[in-house]
């Protein structure tokens, strides 16, 4: 059991007799005094795959589920299925493309370290990515000389197809670090 303000992205909750995977959380702070903060959560139903949206007050109690986490590595694509191998016992985990469509925007062609498969009671629930990823910019407007003092952004397309705003001084071919949960530019990659 946890309060709504303690729920994070990637957690699984039991709500209305449904297992729901938290995909996104919007926090809405009221302007009136005494009003409680609202948490608008978008879920994916684990059993049906349907999208569900619910609102909670910050002190609402929600039943959370403890998940088993296994570290995996992206292996190969088989039709519309993506195969990930367990790093310890090499067991394959299969995901349909529509199950992990959001996550695929952050996984580079050669894979990335830190990917985990979440399971509960032997059932595969989701794929969890690390907090950051380094990706290469493949398309953006040319860098503007002297734009380093500017705080303006421009859209940039990454090697995976992801489009995020980046500072004006960056150009195509540069590797940048992206914060996955917020989909934002963090800095140049090492």
From Swiss-Prot:
Cross-referenced Pfam families: EFP, EFP_N, Elong-fact-P_C
An example molecular function term from Gene Ontology annotations: translation elongation factor activity
CDD domains: S1_EF-P_repeat_1
Cited InterPro entries: Elong-fact-P_C, NA-bd_OB-fold, Rib_uL2_dom2, Transl_elong_fac_P/YeiP, Transl_elong_KOW-like, Transl_elong_p-like_YeiP, Transl_elong_P/YeiP_cen, Transl_elong_P/YeiP_CS
One GO-annotated biological process of the protein: peptide biosynthetic process
Recorded GO CC terms: cytoplasm
Lineage top rank: taxon: Bacteria
Family membership noted in the UniProt record: Belongs to the elongation factor P family.
Protein name: Elongation factor P-like protein
Annotated source species: Pectobacterium atrosepticum (strain SCRI 1043 / ATCC BAA-672) (Erwinia carotovora subsp. atroseptica)
């Amino acid at each position: 059991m946890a309060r709504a303000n303690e729920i994070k992205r990637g957690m699984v909750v039991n709500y209305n007799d449904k297992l729901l995977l938290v995909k996104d959380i919007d926090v809405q702070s009221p302007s009136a005094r005494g009003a409680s903060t609202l948490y608008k959560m978008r879920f994916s139903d684990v059993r049906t795959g349907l999208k569900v949206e619910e609102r909670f007050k910050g002190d609402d109690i929600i039943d959370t589920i403890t998940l088993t986490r296994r570290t995996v590595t992206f292996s190969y694509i088989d039709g519309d299925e993506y195969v990930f191998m367990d790093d310890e016992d090499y067991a394959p985990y299969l995901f349909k493309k529509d199950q992990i469509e959001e996550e695929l925007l952050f996984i580079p062609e050669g894979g990335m370290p830190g990917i985990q498969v979440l399971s509960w009671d032997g059932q595969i629930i989701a794929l969890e990515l690390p907090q950051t990823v380094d990706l290469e910019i493949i398309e953006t407007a040319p860098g503007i000389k002297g734009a380093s003092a500017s705080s303006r952004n421009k859209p940039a397309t990454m090697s995976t197809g992801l489009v995020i705003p980046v500072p004006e001084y960056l150009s195509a071919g540069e590797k940048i670090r992206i914060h996955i949960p917020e989909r934002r530019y963090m800095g140049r990659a090492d």
